[in-house]
């Protein structure tokens, strides 16, 4: 059995823009992480302020830190991703899930619904499988992770199978048509309490490269003679960019979500660019969303947010919750 995850740091001890339940508030405790996860030691350095850190421009260092954090806080003992795939910052991913938990708690008398009765759809699960891993460990939710990339799905499947207790909680499915998001993916009898998505950020490969160069410049690592590794800043094409970028992808998701209004209680998506919010609100109005929530998030100097929407009114959502309580959990064959 995986070890018991360690509790989050008390907000009183470490003021932080991260969610109060986030286990990564404050600075990483590198001495403690190294004691329990010695492989991380090779990548720990002193930053210009004399504090322990890693070189966040080094893909292997970022992977080593993620492995240690996932093992330390979530009991994930085996985790890896193929070269060139997105290596996400754990704290920000956890914040999205905690924000979604708060959204559900607001409709459950202030109590977060936990356990396998609650189902979540992850659009673009990626090779890292990060949202299902954290969401299941924190709240016991079950996940369906979807992706258009067979290599990413194979990586996510390997992570699930390598860690005891995950196979019954995390299922994976390929979206065979990149032109669609929900259509052709969801079966008519499936229902999800939440959907989540970290959409492609850029509109083209060239824009993605410019974004990577900008991040390297901010880290003081930009060298025009070096080829930029994409690992910790982006990944494969579908992870990095799509025609029209984030705004177009989210608009397409909103339009298509209306066709599945009765199968997902709350849809959601990250929106990294503040400038994309007005277009998302307009798309939601056109689609006929009954309620829209914009939840701000922050990690360090980075400001972000997610937007959540539902096509169900209060009475329909109340009926949804009652049906979930009455309906026994049903297992289906693995995808």
Swiss-Prot record:
Keyword set includes Isomerase: no
Keyword Isomerase assigned: no
EC number: 2.1.1.181
MF terms (GO), sorted A to Z: 23S rRNA (adenine(1618)-N(6))-methyltransferase activity
Gene3D superfamilies documented for this protein: Vaccinia Virus protein VP39 (3.40.50.150)
Catalysis performed (reactions): adenosine(1618) in 23S rRNA + S-adenosyl-L-methionine = N(6)-methyladenosine(1618) in 23S rRNA + S-adenosyl-L-homocysteine + H(+)
One family name in Pfam for this protein: Methyltransf_10
GO terms under cellular component: cytoplasm
Top-level lineage group: Bacteria
Residue ranges, annotated region (Disordered): 1-23
Primary localization class, coarse: cytoplasm
Cross-referenced InterPro entries: METTL16/RlmF, rRNA_lsu_MeTfrase_F, SAM-dependent_MTases_sf
Protein family: Belongs to the methyltransferase superfamily. METTL16/RlmF family.
Protein name: Ribosomal RNA large subunit methyltransferase F
Organism annotation: Azotobacter vinelandii (strain DJ / ATCC BAA-1303)
